[in-house]
């Protein structure tokens, strides 16, 4: 194998691809995944998590579907009950689909009669909701006008209706259920719907000419094609890929859905992070089956932009809450990082497909980083609480929830966790790839052999891995063992992050004798005549390492992250003597001791050492610190947390003195987004960020918490302080938000007024100075003193723009 990027086709396989358009090489054989049902885990890290997913996460998610009307919507659509459609989104149907997929994966590994029958009952309701021609989106069938902003007045009217997104998750659930049980009950529903989709969408006369809107149907149709062999499913998936960014039907092109230009012309990852991961996974599926090298060239360019400029050290993607997506290159802010759980899962999907297409370990490196950090941080150790977003810093405002109004992440976790063994192995001809290290037994079928592979390891806490290879018949083949980038001075396969020291050498032995295995594309390749009893031992030294970000990542200046093996660590408040983390710095080279604590957070490695703490008066003192795996934070309640730790006193933040503003409760009156909603739907909500005492650098500084009015353009919006007691005040200072966003810009307001609370009413203050709306500075307002328990800003937003406040001081 040549040591360069290669494309491996699903039917014939490797073709070299790189940005400089080097000639393609003839493939040897395809790289094929090993079904997760053939890999049986028996470790102390993943096995308990997967069992918790089976016994807690899946049942609790189904209960939430029952409680929140997800099943009722299908029953209403199917005429099984009467009632009003429930839920706030046109894609709520996907919640049951995703959980069915996860439950099916669990059934395939460990049969549960009760769960099997429960799935039958749920599928019965879903099938009843399907219209005679195969159509299935309950809010449309139920004619829920409350959600007409999503779907319009008739089928397929709006590109962002999520009808095809619903269909895609239906197909994935149906394929999983069929493979697990052999039952066609849900598969037949999916086929009927897919036949309709193939009839309605396409390049032909009378068909709708547009892409999916929210991608997933692309890779879902490919799954349906692989199960049924029906070519039209592959062709429709290909059509959706090719139609992206063309706007044939006249719809507005948008970065949000990666629909701003044809995929072959794309070179930067933009827009909604989950949509991006799903789209590019689908593109990889289609390109592999249709032998389209041009799409893999595009995917490589886009991936290099993601991994080189937009990937968080936790493997998360998507920096902004606005649009749940990507910001500019190198915008990797920690406190406001979005890193949606679904996006980390999508990142795994995409990287796994890129590995299958190329045989390059760099994709498995990113996959592993996301898997051990960004994905599993999305679910509590108890299995019944979830993060939607996964920031790399918190002041205690983040906490996992049992469910969400937009509940995409819990269902996604249930289906992903059940399939983790799927990412461990792959085959190419008679060769075997080892991508992940988990204690397990696997029965692997190659082109002409059956091989039992048994791993014995304490990974990810211990870097010693023993792999017993037992082929059914003695045979020469290559065992390709991934040597992780973290073991070779490369946290990621780009210059986005680097270690501050050099890695200790790893070692490999076969049957007790050390070998110098050559690496090809990141894999130590062991070619020999394998026979029963052969054992490979790999030792990956797991030293505590410090990680530095590329200088262009502004929010990481003067900070270092802590990594051991594939695990990122963080400081959490309750593990520190003063319960705070931001007033500490840890100089590079500080010794840290790693020890396993079986009784803490279900058993984790803890790092202990001595940090420096900056006091309010500027003094610096030594204090002990403890660091825990990032994925396990917030399992003991809301708390401060940080992944990137200052290495000098200048970058640490002494805990500030409390102020009138910092002690206040911050509120806004949230008007409903839906245009025809009644005024009574307005709610008073907590507004976080404007009184946290983090000093902004500029009006476009979104690295720390701030308040913004989402989807509000040209309106009057309010923000209020509710004080803990009456105060006499005479001055406020407001730092306005102003930055660009593809989904709507944020600008300083056109004007504003300040009100104080007198009894139950609000009165305008008597201003002594001018109301200003300057950028990049505090806008100070003096007024006649008032004694009050509250202040309120009323901001007139500019026409066509939203706005917000970064910080608001009261004197």
Predicted regions and their residues:
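Aromatic (Trp/Tyr) and acidic
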Residues: 24-113, 117, 148-180, 215-232, ...
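Short, hydrophobic/aromatic-enriched beta-strand segments in well-ordered soluble domains
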Residues: 483, 533-544, 723
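Aromatic, loop-rich ligand-recognition surfaces of beta-strand-rich domains
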Residues: 700-768, 772-811
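Bacterial Sec-dependent N-terminal signal peptides
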Residues: 1-27
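Short, surface-exposed beta-strand/strand-loop-strand elements in extracellular ectodomains
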Residues: 165, 492-500, 505-510, 742-759
């Amino acid at each position: 194998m040549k040591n360069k990027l290669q494309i491996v086709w699903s039917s014939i396989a490797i073709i070299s691809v790189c940005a400089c358009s080097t000639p393609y090489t003839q493939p040897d054989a395809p790289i094929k995944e090993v079904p997760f049902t053939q890999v049986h885990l028996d470790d102390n890290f993943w096995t308990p998590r997967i069992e918790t997913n089976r016994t807690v996460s899946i049942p609790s998610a189904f209960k939430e579907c029952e409680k929140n009307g997800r099943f009722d919507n299908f029953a209403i659509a199917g005429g099984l009950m009467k009632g009003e459609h429930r839920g706030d989104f046109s894609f709520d149907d996907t919640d049951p689909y995703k959980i069915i997929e996860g439950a099916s994966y669990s059934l395939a590994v460990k049969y549960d009669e009760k769960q099997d029958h429960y799935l039958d009952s749920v599928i019965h309701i879903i099938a009843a909701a399907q219209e005679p021609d195969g159509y299935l989106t309950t809010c449309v069938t139920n004619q829920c006008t409350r959600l007409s902003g999503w779907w319009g007045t008739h089928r397929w009217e709006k590109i962002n209706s999520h009808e095809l997104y619903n269909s895609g998750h239906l197909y994935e659930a149906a394929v999983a259920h069929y493979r697990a049980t052999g039952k066609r009950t849900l598969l037949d529903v999916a086929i009927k719907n897919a036949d309709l989709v193939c009839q309605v969408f396409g390049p032909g006369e009378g068909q709708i000419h547009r892409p999916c809107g929210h991608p997933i149907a692309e890779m879902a149709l490919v799954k349906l094609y692989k199960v049924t062999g029906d070519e039209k499913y592959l062709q429709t998936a290909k059509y959706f890929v090719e139609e992206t960014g063309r706007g044939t039907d006249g719809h507005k092109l948008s970065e949000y859905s990666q629909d701003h230009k044809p995929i072959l012309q794309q070179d930067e990852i933009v827009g909604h992070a989950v949509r991006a991961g799903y789209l590019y996974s689908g593109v990889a599926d289609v390109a592999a089956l249709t032998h389209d090298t041009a799409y893999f060239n595009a995917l490589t360019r886009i991936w290099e932009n993601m991994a080189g400029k937009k990937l968080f050290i936790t493997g998360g993607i998507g920096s902004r809450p606005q649009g749940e997506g990507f910001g500019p290159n190198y915008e990797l802010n920690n406190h406001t990082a979005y890193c949606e759980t679904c996006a980390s899962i999508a990142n795994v999907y995409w990287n796994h497909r890129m590995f299958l297409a190329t045989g390059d370990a760099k994709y498995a490196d990113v996959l592993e980083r996301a898997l051990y950090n960004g994905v599993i941080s999305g679910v509590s150790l108890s299995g019944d609480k979830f993060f939607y977003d996964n920031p790399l810093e918190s002041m205690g405002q983040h906490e996992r929830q049992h469910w969400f109004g937009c509940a995409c992440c819990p269902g996604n976790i249930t289906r992903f966790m059940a399939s983790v063994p799927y990412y461990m192995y792959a085959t190419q001809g008679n060769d075997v790839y080892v991508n992940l290290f988990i204690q397990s037994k696997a029965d692997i079928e190659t082109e002409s052999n059956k091989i039992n592979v048994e791993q014995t390891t304490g990974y990810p806490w211990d870097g010693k891995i023993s792999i017993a290879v037992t082929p059914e018949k003695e045979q020469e083949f290559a065992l390709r063992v991934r040597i992780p980038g973290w073991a070779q001075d490369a946290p990621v396969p780009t210059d986005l992050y680097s270690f501050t020291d050099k890695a200790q050498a790893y070692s490999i032995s076969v049957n007790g004798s050390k070998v110098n295995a050559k690496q090809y594309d990141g894999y130590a390749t062991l070619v020999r005549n394998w026979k029963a009893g052969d054992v490979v031992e790999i030792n990956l030294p797991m030293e505590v390492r410090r990680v530095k970000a590329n200088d262009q990542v502004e929010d990481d200046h003067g900070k270092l992250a802590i990594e051991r093996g594939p695990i990122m660590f963080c400081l959490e408040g309750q593990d520190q003597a003063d319960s705070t983390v931001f007033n500490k710095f840890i100089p590079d080279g500080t010794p840290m001791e790693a020890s396993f604590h079986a009784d803490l957070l279900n058993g984790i490695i803890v790092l202990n050492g001595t940090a420096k703490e900056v006091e309010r008066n500027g003094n610096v003192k030594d204090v002990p610190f403890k660091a825990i795996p990032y994925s396990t934070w917030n399992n003991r309640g809301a708390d401060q947390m940080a992944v990137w730790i200052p290495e000098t006193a200048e970058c640490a933040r002494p805990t500030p003195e409390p102020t009138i503003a910092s002690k206040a409760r911050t509120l806004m009156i949230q008007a409903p987004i839906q245009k025809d909603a009644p005024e009574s739907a307005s709610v008073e909500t907590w507004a976080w960020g404007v009184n946290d005492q983090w000093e902004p650098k500029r009006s476009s500084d979104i690295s720390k918490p701030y308040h913004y009015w989402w989807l509000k353009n040209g309106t009057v919006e309010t923000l209020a302080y509710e004080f803990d007691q009456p105060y006499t005040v005479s001055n406020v200072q407001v730092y306005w938000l102003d930055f660009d966003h593809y989904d709507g810009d944020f600008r300083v307001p056109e004007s504003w007024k300040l009100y104080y609370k007198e009894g139950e009413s609000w009165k305008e203050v008597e201003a002594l100075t001018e109301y200003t709306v300057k950028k990049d500075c505090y806008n100070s307002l003096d007024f006649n003193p008032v004694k009050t328990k509250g202040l309120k800003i009323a901001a007139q937003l500019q026409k066509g723009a939203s706005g917000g406040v970064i910080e608001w001081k009261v004197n």
